[in-house]
Amino acid sequence: MKRNASGAQAVQIYRVGGSVRDELLGRAGSDRDWVVVGATPEMLIASGYRPVGRDFPVFLHPETHEEYALARTERKHGTGYRGFEFFASPEVTLLQDLERRDLTINAMARAEDGVLIDPFGGAADLRAGVLRHVSPAFAEDPLRVLRVARFAARFAFDVAPATESLLRTLVASGELATIAPERVWRELATGLMEPHPSRMLSVLRECGALVLWLPEVAALYGVPQRIRDHPEIDTGVHLSRALDYAAAKAFALPVRYGVLAHDLGKGATPRRAWPNHSGHEAQSVRLAERMSARLKVPQDCRDAGRLVARWHGVVHAVRALRPAAILDLLSAADALRRPERLDTLLEACECDALSLPGRGGDYAPARYLRDALAAAKGVDAAAVARKAKASAKPSGAADAIAKAVRAARLKALREWRKSNPGLGAKPGTPPPASRPRRRASGA
Protein backbone atom coordinates (compact mmCIF):
# COMPACT_ATOMS: atom_id res chain seq x y z
CA MET A 1 0.00 0.00 0.00
CA LYS A 2 1.25 3.44 -0.81
CA ARG A 3 1.89 5.44 2.32
CA ASN A 4 0.81 8.85 1.15
CA ALA A 5 -1.97 11.34 1.76
CA SER A 6 -5.57 10.24 1.51
CA GLY A 7 -7.93 13.16 1.54
CA ALA A 8 -7.04 15.54 4.34
CA GLN A 9 -5.20 12.96 6.42
CA ALA A 10 -1.99 11.06 5.67
CA VAL A 11 -1.92 7.30 5.99
CA GLN A 12 0.62 6.27 8.61
CA ILE A 13 1.76 2.79 9.54
CA TYR A 14 3.23 1.81 12.91
CA ARG A 15 4.66 -1.39 14.29
CA VAL A 16 2.97 -2.03 17.63
CA GLY A 17 2.59 -4.35 20.57
CA GLY A 18 4.71 -7.35 21.45
CA SER A 19 7.39 -6.94 18.81
CA VAL A 20 8.19 -3.41 20.05
CA ARG A 21 8.24 -4.63 23.65
CA ASP A 22 10.48 -7.59 22.87
CA GLU A 23 12.80 -5.47 20.75
CA LEU A 24 13.40 -3.20 23.77
CA LEU A 25 14.01 -6.27 25.93
CA GLY A 26 16.53 -7.61 23.43
CA ARG A 27 14.34 -10.62 22.67
CA ALA A 28 13.66 -11.96 19.22
CA GLY A 29 10.82 -13.98 17.80
CA SER A 30 7.61 -12.00 18.35
CA ASP A 31 5.31 -11.74 15.37
CA ARG A 32 5.16 -8.22 14.03
CA ASP A 33 1.79 -6.47 14.19
CA TRP A 34 0.97 -3.19 12.50
CA VAL A 35 -1.57 -0.42 12.97
CA VAL A 36 -2.70 1.71 10.04
CA VAL A 37 -3.89 5.24 10.84
CA GLY A 38 -5.88 7.30 8.36
CA ALA A 39 -6.98 4.48 6.03
CA THR A 40 -10.22 2.72 5.14
CA PRO A 41 -10.84 -0.97 4.44
CA GLU A 42 -11.38 -0.15 0.78
CA MET A 43 -7.95 1.45 0.53
CA LEU A 44 -6.24 -1.61 1.97
CA ILE A 45 -8.16 -4.03 -0.23
CA ALA A 46 -7.33 -1.94 -3.30
CA SER A 47 -3.65 -2.24 -2.37
CA GLY A 48 -3.83 -6.04 -2.27
CA TYR A 49 -4.36 -6.62 1.44
CA ARG A 50 -6.63 -9.55 2.32
CA PRO A 51 -9.29 -9.01 5.01
CA VAL A 52 -9.25 -11.63 7.79
CA GLY A 53 -10.76 -9.87 10.81
CA ARG A 54 -14.21 -11.03 11.88
CA ASP A 55 -14.95 -8.46 14.60
CA PHE A 56 -12.81 -5.55 13.39
CA PRO A 57 -10.79 -4.64 10.27
CA VAL A 58 -7.62 -6.75 10.16
CA PHE A 59 -5.78 -7.49 6.92
CA LEU A 60 -2.88 -9.64 5.77
CA HIS A 61 -0.07 -7.96 3.87
CA PRO A 62 0.04 -9.26 0.26
CA GLU A 63 3.74 -10.22 0.53
CA THR A 64 4.76 -10.64 4.17
CA HIS A 65 1.35 -11.94 5.35
CA GLU A 66 1.80 -9.95 8.56
CA GLU A 67 -1.31 -8.53 10.20
CA TYR A 68 -2.26 -4.91 9.61
CA ALA A 69 -5.19 -3.54 11.62
CA LEU A 70 -6.97 -0.25 11.20
CA ALA A 71 -6.61 1.99 14.23
CA ARG A 72 -9.64 1.45 16.42
CA THR A 73 -11.30 2.23 19.72
CA GLU A 74 -13.55 -0.03 21.78
CA ARG A 75 -16.49 0.37 24.11
CA LYS A 76 -17.92 -2.02 26.67
CA HIS A 77 -21.57 -2.80 26.00
CA GLY A 78 -22.11 -6.15 27.73
CA THR A 79 -20.62 -8.60 30.18
CA GLY A 80 -17.58 -10.79 29.79
CA TYR A 81 -14.52 -10.58 27.61
CA ARG A 82 -16.64 -10.59 24.45
CA GLY A 83 -18.89 -7.73 25.53
CA PHE A 84 -17.14 -5.05 23.46
CA GLU A 85 -17.92 -3.17 20.30
CA PHE A 86 -15.14 -1.73 18.17
CA PHE A 87 -15.02 1.43 16.09
CA ALA A 88 -12.48 1.86 13.29
CA SER A 89 -12.24 4.87 11.01
CA PRO A 90 -9.59 7.11 9.43
CA GLU A 91 -10.22 9.60 12.25
CA VAL A 92 -9.05 7.25 15.03
CA THR A 93 -5.58 8.31 16.19
CA LEU A 94 -2.62 6.18 17.18
CA LEU A 95 -2.95 7.43 20.75
CA GLN A 96 -6.57 6.28 20.91
CA ASP A 97 -5.59 2.87 19.56
CA LEU A 98 -2.76 2.45 22.08
CA GLU A 99 -4.95 3.61 24.96
CA ARG A 100 -7.29 0.62 24.60
CA ARG A 101 -4.45 -1.86 25.19
CA ASP A 102 -3.98 -3.71 28.45
CA LEU A 103 -0.49 -2.96 29.77
CA THR A 104 1.92 -0.09 29.24
CA ILE A 105 4.60 -2.51 28.01
CA ASN A 106 2.23 -3.52 25.21
CA ALA A 107 1.12 0.03 24.37
CA MET A 108 4.18 1.26 22.48
CA ALA A 109 4.65 1.84 18.77
CA ARG A 110 7.56 2.23 16.38
CA ALA A 111 7.08 4.76 13.57
CA GLU A 112 8.35 4.18 10.04
CA ASP A 113 11.29 6.49 10.71
CA GLY A 114 12.27 4.43 13.77
CA VAL A 115 10.99 6.82 16.43
CA LEU A 116 9.60 5.11 19.54
CA ILE A 117 6.14 6.32 20.50
CA ASP A 118 5.54 5.59 24.19
CA PRO A 119 2.72 7.74 25.60
CA PHE A 120 2.14 5.64 28.75
CA GLY A 121 5.67 4.95 29.99
CA GLY A 122 5.99 1.38 28.79
CA ALA A 123 9.76 1.57 28.29
CA ALA A 124 10.27 2.76 31.86
CA ASP A 125 8.09 -0.07 33.16
CA LEU A 126 10.13 -2.55 31.13
CA ARG A 127 13.31 -1.28 32.76
CA ALA A 128 11.69 -1.44 36.20
CA GLY A 129 10.17 -4.87 35.63
CA VAL A 130 6.60 -3.72 36.29
CA LEU A 131 3.27 -4.76 34.79
CA ARG A 132 1.04 -1.68 34.83
CA HIS A 133 -2.39 -1.07 33.27
CA VAL A 134 -2.83 1.66 30.67
CA SER A 135 -6.18 3.06 31.79
CA PRO A 136 -9.10 2.31 34.14
CA ALA A 137 -10.78 0.58 31.17
CA PHE A 138 -8.41 -2.30 31.96
CA ALA A 139 -10.98 -3.52 34.50
CA GLU A 140 -13.62 -4.00 31.80
CA ASP A 141 -12.07 -7.19 30.38
CA PRO A 142 -11.90 -10.21 32.73
CA LEU A 143 -9.51 -12.01 30.40
CA ARG A 144 -6.84 -9.52 31.43
CA VAL A 145 -6.50 -11.26 34.79
CA LEU A 146 -5.08 -14.26 32.97
CA ARG A 147 -3.01 -12.12 30.62
CA VAL A 148 -1.30 -10.29 33.47
CA ALA A 149 -0.57 -13.59 35.21
CA ARG A 150 0.82 -14.99 31.97
CA PHE A 151 3.11 -11.99 31.41
CA ALA A 152 4.31 -12.31 35.01
CA ALA A 153 5.23 -15.92 34.23
CA ARG A 154 7.04 -14.85 31.07
CA PHE A 155 9.07 -11.93 32.39
CA ALA A 156 9.04 -12.46 36.19
CA PHE A 157 7.82 -8.86 36.48
CA ASP A 158 5.97 -7.45 39.49
CA VAL A 159 2.39 -6.22 39.23
CA ALA A 160 1.94 -2.53 40.02
CA PRO A 161 -0.15 -2.03 43.20
CA ALA A 162 -2.85 -0.08 41.36
CA THR A 163 -3.05 -2.79 38.70
CA GLU A 164 -3.31 -5.48 41.36
CA SER A 165 -6.20 -3.53 42.86
CA LEU A 166 -7.96 -3.57 39.48
CA LEU A 167 -7.36 -7.32 39.21
CA ARG A 168 -9.15 -7.77 42.53
CA THR A 169 -11.96 -5.56 41.25
CA LEU A 170 -12.32 -7.80 38.21
CA VAL A 171 -12.42 -10.91 40.40
CA ALA A 172 -15.04 -9.35 42.68
CA SER A 173 -17.20 -8.38 39.69
CA GLY A 174 -18.00 -12.03 38.98
CA GLU A 175 -17.12 -11.60 35.31
CA LEU A 176 -14.40 -14.24 35.44
CA ALA A 177 -17.22 -16.78 35.27
CA THR A 178 -18.04 -15.55 31.74
CA ILE A 179 -14.76 -16.86 30.32
CA ALA A 180 -15.21 -20.22 28.61
CA PRO A 181 -13.30 -23.10 30.25
CA GLU A 182 -11.45 -23.78 27.00
CA ARG A 183 -10.16 -20.20 26.95
CA VAL A 184 -9.15 -20.36 30.61
CA TRP A 185 -7.22 -23.55 29.89
CA ARG A 186 -5.54 -22.04 26.85
CA GLU A 187 -4.24 -19.11 28.90
CA LEU A 188 -3.22 -21.34 31.83
CA ALA A 189 -1.42 -23.72 29.49
CA THR A 190 0.49 -20.83 27.94
CA GLY A 191 1.44 -19.63 31.40
CA LEU A 192 2.61 -23.08 32.43
CA MET A 193 4.93 -23.09 29.42
CA GLU A 194 6.52 -19.75 30.31
CA PRO A 195 9.93 -19.57 32.06
CA HIS A 196 8.46 -18.76 35.50
CA PRO A 197 5.11 -20.58 35.85
CA SER A 198 5.11 -20.10 39.62
CA ARG A 199 4.67 -16.37 39.05
CA MET A 200 1.39 -17.05 37.24
CA LEU A 201 0.07 -18.95 40.25
CA SER A 202 1.30 -16.21 42.57
CA VAL A 203 -0.47 -13.42 40.67
CA LEU A 204 -3.70 -15.41 40.42
CA ARG A 205 -3.54 -16.25 44.11
CA GLU A 206 -2.89 -12.69 45.23
CA CYS A 207 -5.87 -11.29 43.33
CA GLY A 208 -8.25 -14.09 44.36
CA ALA A 209 -8.58 -15.75 40.95
CA LEU A 210 -6.67 -18.95 41.73
CA VAL A 211 -9.37 -20.25 44.07
CA LEU A 212 -11.97 -19.65 41.33
CA TRP A 213 -10.15 -21.32 38.44
CA LEU A 214 -7.87 -23.78 40.26
CA PRO A 215 -9.38 -24.36 43.72
CA GLU A 216 -7.54 -27.68 44.02
CA VAL A 217 -4.22 -25.85 43.60
CA ALA A 218 -5.20 -22.92 45.83
CA ALA A 219 -5.91 -25.38 48.66
CA LEU A 220 -2.24 -26.46 48.74
CA TYR A 221 -0.86 -23.16 50.02
CA GLY A 222 -0.34 -23.18 53.77
CA VAL A 223 -0.58 -26.98 54.04
CA PRO A 224 2.53 -28.31 55.83
CA GLN A 225 4.51 -31.42 54.93
CA ARG A 226 7.07 -33.40 56.91
CA ILE A 227 10.24 -31.36 57.04
CA ARG A 228 12.49 -34.39 56.53
CA ASP A 229 10.86 -34.98 53.13
CA HIS A 230 10.11 -31.38 52.21
CA PRO A 231 12.44 -28.76 53.72
CA GLU A 232 10.27 -26.03 52.20
CA ILE A 233 7.36 -27.42 54.32
CA ASP A 234 4.53 -25.56 52.53
CA THR A 235 2.94 -27.78 49.85
CA GLY A 236 2.11 -24.79 47.65
CA VAL A 237 5.68 -23.53 47.81
CA HIS A 238 6.90 -27.00 46.82
CA LEU A 239 4.53 -27.02 43.83
CA SER A 240 5.84 -23.63 42.72
CA ARG A 241 9.44 -24.82 42.92
CA ALA A 242 8.62 -28.01 41.01
CA LEU A 243 6.89 -26.08 38.21
CA ASP A 244 9.83 -23.70 37.84
CA TYR A 245 12.17 -26.71 37.74
CA ALA A 246 10.08 -28.15 34.90
CA ALA A 247 10.38 -24.84 33.06
CA ALA A 248 14.15 -24.71 33.57
CA LYS A 249 14.39 -28.20 32.06
CA ALA A 250 12.10 -27.20 29.15
CA PHE A 251 9.78 -30.14 29.83
CA ALA A 252 6.63 -30.48 27.72
CA LEU A 253 3.17 -29.30 28.74
CA PRO A 254 1.89 -32.76 29.83
CA VAL A 255 4.84 -33.03 32.22
CA ARG A 256 4.10 -29.61 33.70
CA TYR A 257 0.43 -30.44 34.07
CA GLY A 258 1.41 -33.68 35.79
CA VAL A 259 3.51 -31.63 38.21
CA LEU A 260 0.55 -29.31 38.79
CA ALA A 261 -1.62 -32.30 39.70
CA HIS A 262 0.80 -34.54 41.58
CA ASP A 263 0.10 -33.43 45.16
CA LEU A 264 -3.46 -32.12 44.92
CA GLY A 265 -4.64 -34.66 47.48
CA LYS A 266 -2.56 -33.01 50.20
CA GLY A 267 -4.93 -30.06 50.08
CA ALA A 268 -7.72 -32.41 51.19
CA THR A 269 -5.83 -33.91 54.16
CA PRO A 270 -7.66 -33.21 57.45
CA ARG A 271 -5.78 -30.65 59.56
CA ARG A 272 -5.53 -33.11 62.45
CA ALA A 273 -3.34 -35.37 60.27
CA TRP A 274 -0.84 -32.67 59.24
CA PRO A 275 2.01 -32.86 58.34
CA ASN A 276 1.37 -36.47 57.28
CA HIS A 277 -0.53 -37.14 54.06
CA SER A 278 -1.06 -40.88 54.02
CA GLY A 279 -3.02 -42.02 50.98
CA HIS A 280 -2.91 -38.62 49.30
CA GLU A 281 -2.26 -40.23 45.91
CA ALA A 282 -5.82 -41.53 45.57
CA GLN A 283 -7.20 -38.13 46.53
CA SER A 284 -4.81 -36.49 44.07
CA VAL A 285 -6.17 -38.66 41.25
CA ARG A 286 -9.75 -37.72 42.11
CA LEU A 287 -8.98 -34.01 42.29
CA ALA A 288 -6.85 -34.09 39.14
CA GLU A 289 -9.74 -35.67 37.26
CA ARG A 290 -12.12 -33.02 38.57
CA MET A 291 -9.78 -30.20 37.58
CA SER A 292 -9.19 -31.69 34.13
CA ALA A 293 -12.90 -32.14 33.44
CA ARG A 294 -13.80 -28.63 34.58
CA LEU A 295 -11.15 -26.97 32.40
CA LYS A 296 -11.70 -29.35 29.46
CA VAL A 297 -8.01 -30.23 29.50
CA PRO A 298 -6.77 -32.14 26.41
CA GLN A 299 -6.36 -35.88 26.77
CA ASP A 300 -2.56 -36.01 26.86
CA CYS A 301 -2.43 -33.61 29.79
CA ARG A 302 -5.38 -35.28 31.51
CA ASP A 303 -3.64 -38.66 31.27
CA ALA A 304 -0.43 -37.16 32.63
CA GLY A 305 -2.22 -35.57 35.57
CA ARG A 306 -3.82 -38.88 36.53
CA LEU A 307 -0.64 -40.90 35.98
CA VAL A 308 1.67 -38.65 37.99
CA ALA A 309 -0.84 -38.14 40.80
CA ARG A 310 -1.23 -41.90 41.26
CA TRP A 311 2.33 -43.16 40.82
CA HIS A 312 4.87 -40.48 41.78
CA GLY A 313 5.40 -41.88 45.28
CA VAL A 314 5.92 -45.39 43.94
CA VAL A 315 8.42 -44.15 41.35
CA HIS A 316 10.48 -42.41 44.05
CA ALA A 317 10.74 -45.76 45.91
CA VAL A 318 11.08 -47.96 42.83
CA ARG A 319 14.47 -49.41 43.74
CA ALA A 320 12.84 -51.13 46.73
CA LEU A 321 10.15 -52.79 44.59
CA ARG A 322 10.11 -56.45 43.64
CA PRO A 323 10.12 -57.29 39.92
CA ALA A 324 6.38 -58.04 39.95
CA ALA A 325 5.62 -54.59 41.32
CA ILE A 326 7.96 -52.98 38.78
CA LEU A 327 6.11 -54.76 35.98
CA ASP A 328 2.79 -53.58 37.45
CA LEU A 329 4.08 -50.01 37.36
CA LEU A 330 5.26 -50.32 33.76
CA SER A 331 1.87 -51.77 32.81
CA ALA A 332 0.01 -48.99 34.60
CA ALA A 333 1.98 -46.44 32.59
CA ASP A 334 1.35 -48.47 29.41
CA ALA A 335 5.10 -48.10 28.96
CA LEU A 336 5.56 -51.28 26.93
CA ARG A 337 3.32 -49.93 24.16
CA ARG A 338 3.81 -46.19 24.71
CA PRO A 339 7.22 -45.51 26.28
CA GLU A 340 6.65 -41.77 25.97
CA ARG A 341 4.10 -42.06 28.79
CA LEU A 342 6.82 -43.40 31.07
CA ASP A 343 9.05 -40.48 30.05
CA THR A 344 6.29 -38.05 31.04
CA LEU A 345 5.88 -39.75 34.41
CA LEU A 346 9.61 -39.85 35.11
CA GLU A 347 10.20 -36.24 34.13
CA ALA A 348 7.38 -35.07 36.40
CA CYS A 349 8.76 -37.20 39.24
CA GLU A 350 12.18 -35.65 38.67
CA CYS A 351 10.63 -32.21 39.12
CA ASP A 352 9.03 -33.36 42.37
CA ALA A 353 12.27 -34.80 43.75
CA LEU A 354 15.05 -32.55 42.48
CA SER A 355 13.30 -29.21 43.01
CA LEU A 356 13.67 -29.70 46.77
CA PRO A 357 16.18 -27.38 48.47
CA GLY A 358 19.65 -28.90 48.42
CA ARG A 359 18.80 -31.54 45.84
CA GLY A 360 20.38 -31.90 42.43
CA GLY A 361 22.18 -34.26 40.09
CA ASP A 362 20.56 -37.19 38.33
CA TYR A 363 17.20 -38.67 39.21
CA ALA A 364 18.23 -42.29 39.79
CA PRO A 365 14.74 -43.87 39.60
CA ALA A 366 14.42 -42.67 36.00
CA ARG A 367 17.51 -44.51 34.84
CA TYR A 368 16.45 -47.56 36.85
CA LEU A 369 12.95 -47.73 35.36
CA ARG A 370 14.17 -47.13 31.82
CA ASP A 371 16.61 -50.02 32.22
CA ALA A 372 13.79 -52.16 33.61
CA LEU A 373 11.61 -51.27 30.64
CA ALA A 374 14.39 -52.25 28.25
CA ALA A 375 14.69 -55.61 30.00
CA ALA A 376 10.94 -56.25 29.81
CA LYS A 377 10.81 -55.20 26.15
CA GLY A 378 13.62 -57.63 25.39
CA VAL A 379 11.10 -60.45 25.66
CA ASP A 380 9.83 -61.71 22.30
CA ALA A 381 6.18 -61.40 23.30
CA ALA A 382 4.94 -62.64 19.92
CA ALA A 383 6.92 -65.88 20.20
CA VAL A 384 5.76 -66.41 23.79
CA ALA A 385 2.16 -65.80 22.72
CA ARG A 386 2.37 -68.31 19.86
CA LYS A 387 3.72 -70.98 22.16
CA ALA A 388 1.08 -70.31 24.82
CA LYS A 389 -1.73 -70.32 22.27
CA ALA A 390 -0.61 -73.64 20.83
CA SER A 391 -0.87 -75.39 24.18
CA ALA A 392 -4.02 -73.68 25.49
CA LYS A 393 -7.68 -74.50 25.04
CA PRO A 394 -9.35 -72.12 22.55
CA SER A 395 -11.68 -70.75 25.22
CA GLY A 396 -8.79 -69.86 27.51
CA ALA A 397 -6.19 -68.79 24.96
CA ALA A 398 -6.30 -65.08 25.72
CA ASP A 399 -5.80 -65.61 29.44
CA ALA A 400 -3.04 -68.15 28.84
CA ILE A 401 -1.21 -65.76 26.51
CA ALA A 402 -1.42 -62.89 28.99
CA LYS A 403 -0.09 -65.05 31.82
CA ALA A 404 2.72 -66.45 29.70
CA VAL A 405 3.86 -63.04 28.48
CA ARG A 406 3.77 -61.66 32.01
CA ALA A 407 5.74 -64.63 33.32
CA ALA A 408 8.37 -64.16 30.60
CA ARG A 409 8.73 -60.48 31.40
CA LEU A 410 8.97 -61.20 35.12
CA LYS A 411 11.74 -63.68 34.40
CA ALA A 412 13.56 -61.07 32.32
CA LEU A 413 13.26 -58.51 35.14
CA ARG A 414 14.52 -60.99 37.74
CA GLU A 415 17.52 -61.83 35.57
CA TRP A 416 18.18 -58.13 35.00
CA ARG A 417 18.11 -57.47 38.75
CA LYS A 418 20.31 -60.48 39.44
CA SER A 419 22.91 -59.36 36.90
CA ASN A 420 22.86 -55.79 38.29
CA PRO A 421 22.84 -56.24 42.08
CA GLY A 422 23.92 -52.66 42.70
CA LEU A 423 20.68 -51.36 41.24
CA GLY A 424 18.44 -52.54 44.06
CA ALA A 425 17.62 -50.90 47.34
CA LYS A 426 20.43 -50.49 49.83
CA PRO A 427 20.47 -52.93 52.77
CA GLY A 428 17.88 -51.92 55.32
CA THR A 429 15.80 -49.89 52.87
CA PRO A 430 12.16 -50.54 53.71
CA PRO A 431 9.72 -51.41 50.93
CA PRO A 432 7.12 -48.82 49.96
CA ALA A 433 4.03 -48.70 52.13
CA SER A 434 1.78 -50.16 49.46
CA ARG A 435 2.40 -52.36 46.45
CA PRO A 436 1.12 -50.99 43.12
CA ARG A 437 -2.14 -52.52 42.06
CA ARG A 438 -2.13 -54.38 38.78
CA ARG A 439 -3.81 -52.51 35.95
CA ALA A 440 -4.13 -53.43 32.33
CA SER A 441 -3.37 -49.92 31.10
CA GLY A 442 -3.71 -46.29 32.04
CA ALA A 443 -3.30 -45.03 35.58
Predicted regions and their residues:
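Catalytic cores of the polymerase beta-like nucleotidyltransferase superfamily
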Residues: 1-443
